[in-house]
Amino acid sequence: MPWIQLRIDTDGPHADALSDQLMEEGSISITFEDGKDTPIYEPTLGETPLWNHTVIIALFEADHDLVPVVERLKLLPYLGENFSHKIEQVEDKDWEREWMDNFHPIKFGDRLWICPSWREIPDPTAVNVILDPGLAFGTGTHPTTALCLEWLDGLDYRNKDVIDFGCGSGILAVAALKLGAEKVTGVDIDYQAIEASKANAERNGVEDQLALYLPEDQPEGLIADILVANILAGPLRELAPLIAEKVKPGGQLALSGLLKEQADEVSAFYSQWFEMDAPAHKDDWSRLTGIRK
């Protein structure tokens, strides 16, 4: 079935209201895009992340008459008579297949591959984590996840256990187990993350070695030889004392989810507990590592 789409330029504060209006007009899907190539790095907790200049793309069936839709939108006070918009024909495609075609196995470090389940494993002798892209949690394509996976690939896991603090999809926890960790504990504030981590551990056959907790349920005195936290700079600062007490003396730490310009400040803050290394960078993002004093 062919489609048409209506692209509208708006500002962030009005994007949600406009999205609701377009759904009432019969749109079958709404997509938000950055209108000025301005990335969002750290939205306020509970806030819908939207750019100051947002492009809304509303998809309609091809026989939907968009002329009266546009006329009604002109009556909205935050759009007005001359709002910027474009109507486009959309090629009919197998969208699910196209989405799947965009994901390929990715290698991290010397040993580790992250492979979608529908792709052939490039190197059966390597350490392979099977993980399908999801809507909410990491799959290895984001620079911060990649930085953490590369670090994990280079560690010695003999007789060591790991904490994945903010486990999300469980990609880091599962990777550590496949790389040789004896036990991993994953902690996340989101119950959906716990469920996603559990499912990915089961898919990779390491569920018996992975313990998963919401913060309020984690065991007292939880401590490990290795801790990785791929969250954001704000929580990394706020939770620093808690994170530090979960790493054994001489244990290893990796922090990511922070921008290049945030790295030095966060590193200096953690230096009261850790001997910190120079930051590693990928694109605009950084990873910090250190050894517990």
UniProtKB/Swiss-Prot annotation:
Subcellular location: Cytoplasm
List of residues binding S-adenosyl-L-methionine: T145, G166, D188, N230
Catalytic reaction list: L-lysyl-[protein] + 3 S-adenosyl-L-methionine = N(6),N(6),N(6)-trimethyl-L-lysyl-[protein] + 3 S-adenosyl-L-homocysteine + 3 H(+)
Family: Belongs to the methyltransferase superfamily. PrmA family.
The keyword NAD is assigned to this record: no
Job description of the protein: Methylates ribosomal protein L11.
Name recorded for this polypeptide: Ribosomal protein L11 methyltransferase
Broad class of where this protein is predominantly found: cytoplasm
NCBIfam families to which the protein is assigned, alphabetical: prmA
Keyword Lyase: no
Name of the coding gene: prmA
Cellular component, GO, one term: cytosol
Keywords of the record: Cytoplasm, Methyltransferase, S-adenosyl-L-methionine, Transferase
Organism whose genome encodes this protein: Shewanella piezotolerans (strain WP3 / JCM 13877)
